[in-house]
Amino acid sequence: MPGPISNRPITTPTIGAPNVPPRSFDVSQVTAQELAKLKQSSPSLAKTIEQAKTTYAAELKAGARITVTTTAANGGAPVLTLVPPGFDPKKPATVQTHYHGDVTSVAAPNGSHTGNIKEQFARDPQRVFVLPEAQGNVGGTGTNWNNVRDQAGTVTDALAGAGVSPVEGSKYVVSAHSAGGRALAAAMKPPGTLKADQLVLLDCLYESTNGPGANTAILNAVKAGGLKNVSDVVIVATGSYPADRDAAMKSAGGDKVRMEKLVPRQGLSNHEASARNHLVPKPR
């Protein structure tokens, strides 16, 4: 979302609930009574389940499998997993981890990523979305992503909770929009551990107002081998930050990095359109 989206400095991730095993909830099966109990014990978990029930009501009715998992890999914060109707477990999948920006949440009904995900459900039943939530300021500005610890572990636990076991030939994507760049910066530590064949940077190369921010952290990770497992990096920029940041990323990432021209969308700012129209980039 627009605004001063990366004024929170990159810090050492907070380790949350390191010894608690993952828990998963099938959104369609959680009763009102269970939800009421969760609101007392795990408010953020309950809110994610409740929002997902409403936001994806039509998709659930059509046969989508939607789960919410808590895992130490995401610092104990909820992870929403979306398996489209018609998903075939015998065919290769594309598993996309997406870190959202400010003023939204993983299951926000009006989230710029939400609209694109709904479109992708109709286009590609083999694309599974894994949406880790932040630990603080969710839905506001200055989203607190200090909970991000292990993106690969988050994906493993989320897929297990959804009953998805990707077969040979499956691909992995990581995307970040806006303030989600801070989450990506944390996910790229240590460099080379990102579980991704493709990395999608959606207007997320911002700095902090009081020092280096996501852009510097991501660039340093790329220089240190952070694209070890990545073959394709797509940058979608809107001109809201200096263009030399894109150039620096292209220089560090070499031929793996390409720019995708922003496609505007009526009624949305270019910043929002970067996620609404480019969550799934065009093929290389």
Predicted features and spans:
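C-terminal catalytic histidine-bearing segment of alpha/beta-hydrolase fold enzymes
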Residues: V234-R284
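Alpha/beta-hydrolase-fold catalytic nucleophile elbow
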Residues: E133, S175, L202-D203, V236
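Alpha/beta-hydrolase fold nucleophile elbow
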Residues: P166-S178
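Active-site nucleophile loop of the alpha/beta-hydrolase fold
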Residues: L199-T209, A237-S240
